[in-house]
Amino acid sequence: MDIFLAGPAAQLLARNPPHLLAGNRSLCCSFPQRRGGRAALLAVLLCLCGLMLAPASQALHQPLWELGIGVGALSTPPYRGSDSRVNYIVPFPYFIYRGSFLRVDREGGIRGKLFSGDDISFDLSLAANVPVRNEDDGARRGMDDLDPLIELGTELSIDLWRSQDRDQRFGLDIPLRAVYSVGNPLLEYQGLTLSPFLNYRIWQEDEGALMRYSVSAGPIFATSRYHDYFYEVDSRFVTPERPEYHADSGYSGSRVTISVTRHFSKYLIGAFARYDDLNGAVFEDSPLVETSDYFVVGLVFGWILGESSTMVQH
């Protein structure tokens, strides 16, 4: 669930839970659920796999830093398990830094490298969720709004396979983070999350543009305190349709994410789609869970205003 220091939003959206951007609710989208949703996801995956069959390039070099501005759009449920949707359009500053220790990029958000070897790395990482505002007719009607969350922790990345030119990678990434709400009190501990995922990436050059394709999938686990933050029904908020509920620790569902980014000399475009499945989650029987699967989609466009003359190997 990586969030960027200053906004490469396509990968921010693609790797994180669906509460990542705040802004004007100005889009209008609807998406198929259950069998229809899974069939649509399969079709998108097949299209992306077709793109991935194109030949990959040699080792790539990119500027040490890039600076610009962009705009992102996101359509998502307000929280995992809600059957309503919120739609955001958000401007953001765009900053990428590809240093040997500190990296801010589309691959993994903000990362401070604690250790890096040929096939394994251990990084510091940061994530965030925007607040959840309750609607008049939703499952959380009459309940308190939820403060935004920040997540601080580490991520272990293991390369299971890389191509000879290092422009394709299949690996296992294991983020473990402590979660804190930001509000009143200023910071309050809200549990732990663990979300290991398998990831396949391709980088290639195409007519002067750098293309990046990614497919990832994996489960999510969290403590009862984290689950209660979203799915608990305290005795104060019990109604005939909404019984008291307290969540357990354990399995939080699974997700499949695909993303494509095209990086030109002065601008970039990107898109992602994620399918989230809550079947079997320990909080699935919460009265606040209205659907057990859904889609999240996002788009991003960025303008690069300046970049370093120093090039580093990608």
Whereabouts are the PLM-identified features?
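Predominantly the C-terminal beta-signal and adjacent terminal strand-loop region
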Residues: V256-H314
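Outer-membrane beta-barrel translocator domains and adjoining extracellular loop/strand segments
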Residues: R80-R85, E135-R140, G183-Q190, R225-D234, ...
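Residues on the lipid-exposed face of transmembrane beta-strands in outer-membrane beta-barrel proteins
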Residues: V71-S75, P91-Y97, G108-L114, L152-I158, ...
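Outer-membrane beta-barrel transmembrane domain signature
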Residues: L186-L268, D276-N279
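N-terminal signal peptide c-region/cleavage motif recognized by signal peptidases
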Residues: C49, A54-A56
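Residues that define the transmembrane beta-barrel architecture of outer-membrane proteins
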Residues: W65, R85-P91, D118, L146-L152, ...
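Short loop/turn motifs that connect adjacent beta-strands in outer-membrane beta-barrel proteins
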Residues: A59-W65, R80-G81, S100-S121, W161-F170, ...
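Sequence/structural signature of outer-membrane beta-barrel proteins
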Residues: L74-R80, N129-E135, D159-S163, R177-P185, ...
